[in-house]
Structure formats: structure tokens, C-alpha cells
Regions:
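DNA-recognition alpha helix
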Residues: 34-47
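Short, basic alpha-helical nucleic acid-contact segments in DNA-binding proteins
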Residues: 48, 56-78, 147, 156-158
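Basic, short loop/linker segments at the boundary and entry of helix-turn-helix/winged-helix-like folds
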Residues: 1-31, 46-50, 55-56, 75-81, ...
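Short conserved beta-strand segments at catalytic cores or DNA/RNA-binding microdomains
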Residues: 32, 90, 94-106, 116, ...
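Helix-centered, glycine/charged polyanion-binding patches within enzymatic domains
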Residues: 143-207, 211
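Mobile genetic element proteins and their domesticated derivatives, centered on retroelements
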Residues: 24, 38, 54, 83, ...
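Active-site beta-loop-alpha junctions of metal-dependent nucleic acid enzymes
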Residues: 15, 60, 109-132
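C-terminal domain-tail junction helix/linker
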Residues: 189, 198-208, 213-239
Length: 239
């Protein structure tokens, strides 16, 4: 008797195979392709899928894929470089807060509609939650006053922030400004974001792909470890 194929529950009631869904999502967040490009590429493989279906796959599965990859995330260094970059949504500028360590590895990111004190505080809290139990030793900022004030206010909430050295250096922050370029290049090939939620999900996928390229995940020292093609690494992460 043939054994039934065990299907990942996240693909339950989906008409397309999991392999097709994963391929489209992976290619979209990794390469400079539009949804229509991917739909045309699938047709060449004999698979008819609309570009709107691929869009729904990205919005549905990127958060789950990110969660599964994060099980294998390497810890990052405790010296942060923090900066914001502009992202256009519905014709208006929004702000993507990002932090990398001194080696250029991504610490965390957060999309916000504004650039105020509350936005900066929200980012620092999120980045800290990602890094715990390790606290940052140093945080390097640009000259944006709200970010400095946000850290001063956080010190009043939690005295442990007082042990974090805060620096302001445009030279040291060149590292993260260079790192922004990979994200901006991918966004430039899109026709703009139509909603804040869609932008947040898509950007988290782009950031995930960027972290994979930077070698920020480890699958241990087993038979295969971190070797293999990008496809094989994805298969291990999603298993």
C-alpha cells in the first residue's frame, strides 16, 4: 500500500504544490523580479498561476518562512550601527529603521510611517528583544536628534540602557548606509507598495534574503552543515 504524502499544514487546501509556492516566494524576495515576471516564468514551466496569486503567497508565507529561518540564526555582535532609510508607500515616504553590527551583519529592522521618538523607541525595543539575552555594548547613530532622545528616554525606563555606550559618527555609520543599498536596489525594481502591511511583509522577506546572503544562519556541523545550493539551504530551513 502506498504511503500518503505528508503535506506541511501551512499548505493545506492550496491547489499548487508547496515546491511551486516556495520557489515563487524565494525568487521574488531574492531577485529583481516582478509578480508578472514570475507568472511568465511559471508559464514556461507549464504552470499557469496569476501574478495576484503570487502576491498573496508572498504576503501569506514570508512571515512563516522568516520564523522558520530564525531557528537557525547566528547571534550577532553587540556593537550596533543604526540608521533609517526612506521607503515609498502609496506615494508617501515611510521610514525603515535598520541596524547592523560592526561586521555588517543585520541585527534587526522595523518599518514605521514616521521618524519620531516613539518610532525610534519601538525599533530599539524590537532590536533588543531579537538580541536578548545579549545587550548591546555600543550603539552608533547619525546626527538625528530623535534617535538620541529615544535612547535617553529608554534609560529612564530601564537602567540597563545606561550601560550602553552611545556614539554619533557619520564615518562609522557608512557601513549601514552601504548595507541599505541592497534593500533599496530590490525595492527600486518594484512599482511601489500599495499598502503598509504589504510593504512590511515584503521588506521582511527582502531582509531575510539579505541575511541569508551574508551567512547569518547556521545548520550545525552535521552531514551537510551549511554547504549546498541556495535551494538546499531553503529546504533545510523550512523542514
Amino acid at each position: 500500500m502506498t504511503k500518503p504524502i505528508i503535506r506541511d499544514p501551512i499548505y493545506r487546501r492550496r491547489r499548487f504544490d508547496a515546491e511551486i509556492i516556495e520557489l515563487c516566494v524565494r525568487w521574488y524576495i531574492t531577485y529583481r523580479l516582478s509578480y508578472r515576471d514570475l507568472a511568465a516564468m511559471m508559464v514556461e514551466r507549464g504552470i499557469v498561476v496569476s501574478h495576484t496569486t503570487i502576491l498573496r503567497w508572498v504576503n501569506r508565507y514570508v512571515p512563516e518562512f522568516e520564523k522558520r529561518w530564525n531557528r537557525y540564526a547566528r547571534p550577532v555582535n553587540t556593537s550596533w550601527r543604526v540608521d533609517e532609510t526612506y521607503i515609498k508607500i502609496q506615494g508617501k515616504w515611510n521610514f525603515l529603521y535598520r541596524a547592523v553590527n560592526k561586521y555588517g551583519k543585520t541585527v534587526d529592522f522595523l518599518l514605521r510611517p514616521d521618524r519620531g521618538i516613539a518610532a525610534a523607541q519601538a525599533f530599539f525595543r524590537k532590536a533588543l528583544a531579537t538580541s536578548l539575552p545579549r545587550w548591546p555594548r555600543k550603539i552608533t547613530l547619525d546626527g538625528h536628534k530623535q534617535s538620541h532622545l529615544a535612547l535617553r528616554l529608554l534609560r529612564r525606563e530601564d537602567p540597563r540602557w545606561k550601560f550602553v555606550q552611545v556614539r554619533s559618527s557619520q564615518y562609522l555609520n557608512n557601513l549601514i548606509e552601504q548595507d541599505h543599498r541592497a534593500i533599496k536596489r530590490r525595492c527600486a525594481s518594484m512599482c511601489g507598495f500599495k499598502s503598509f502591511r504589504s510593504a512590511a511583509v515584503t521588506l521582511s522577506g527582502i531582509e531575510l534574503s539579505h541575511r541569508i546572503r551574508k551567512g547569518q544562519f547556521s545548520f550545525g556541523r552535521g552531514r551537510y552543515g551549511n554547504s549546498g545550493s541556495l535551494k538546499q539551504l531553503w529546504e533545510r530551513a523550512l523542514a
